[in-house]
């Protein structure tokens, strides 16, 4: 599967030194995240994968450990962790988090602040941008409860990727397909690119009071101290 990206080649180094967390939940689409993890690693990102226990029924954690070079995190109380509060430690490193595929169950947990496994506790501790890619049966996706939960996540700053429509693993046809890995990668690249919107640009900042002439004698002015301009500069 060859990924084709919308950003120019010279901008691919934007992931160098960046940490991406991938949250994988129980869905048949979980196998696609192996392609995404591999693509991120090739672009020099530091990639950490967190899985729910249900996700391990669809893809083995060893797959992600091989592709990323990092331990795949599943169990909150794993005895092999280094001495640190692991979910907080990983959360602090993250520049962006993507939950894909995101099941109805995990979407509901995140929307209502339920943190009962490694994935949800880590996401609750993250202050970076969070992207959610729902993947489920059409009837589940269109369920008003799921839609309300997605709206709640958007209210709290999550970006929700609308699922594609097509033939689903259950045999139905409709909305609920997770987008292909290359599209998910583009979402991550665009998010990281926002940090560098002004990179290499020259910006002129003016500070202090201004004067606008009414006629040769009178003018309108203000009492601005210029402190805000100095802070911005």
Feature map (PLM): residue ranges:
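A cross-family phosphate/adenosyl-ligand binding-site feature
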Residues: 2-131, 137-226, 230-233
């Amino acid at each position: 599967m060859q990924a084709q990206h919308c950003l120019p080649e010279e901008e691919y180094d934007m992931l160098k030194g960046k940490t991406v967390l991938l949250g994988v939940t129980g869905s048949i689409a979980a196998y696609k995240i192996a392609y995404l993890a591999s693509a991120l690693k090739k672009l020099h990102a530091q990639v950490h994968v967190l899985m729910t226990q249900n996700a391990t029924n669809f893809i083995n954690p060893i797959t992600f450990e091989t592709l990323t070079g990092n331990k795949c995190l599943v169990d909150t109380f794993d005895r092999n962790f280094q001495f640190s509060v692991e979910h907080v430690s990983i959360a602090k490193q993250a520049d962006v988090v993507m939950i894909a595929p995101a099941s109805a169950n995990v979407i509901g947990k995140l929307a209502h602040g339920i943190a009962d496994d490694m994935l949800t506790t880590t996401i609750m501790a993250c202050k970076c941008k969070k992207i959610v890619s729902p993947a489920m049966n059409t009837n589940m996706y269109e369920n008003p409860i799921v839609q309300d939960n997605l709206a709640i996540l958007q209210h709290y700053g999550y970006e929700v990727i609308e699922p594609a429509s097509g033939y689903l693993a259950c045999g139905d046809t409709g909305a609920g397909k997770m987008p292909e890995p290359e599209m998910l990668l583009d979402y991550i690249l665009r998010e990281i690119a926002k940090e560098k919107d002004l990179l290499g640009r020259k910006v002129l900042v003016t500070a202090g009071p201004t004067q606008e002439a009414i006629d040769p004698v009178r003018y309108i002015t203000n009492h601005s101290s210029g402190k805000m301009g100095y802070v911005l500069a």
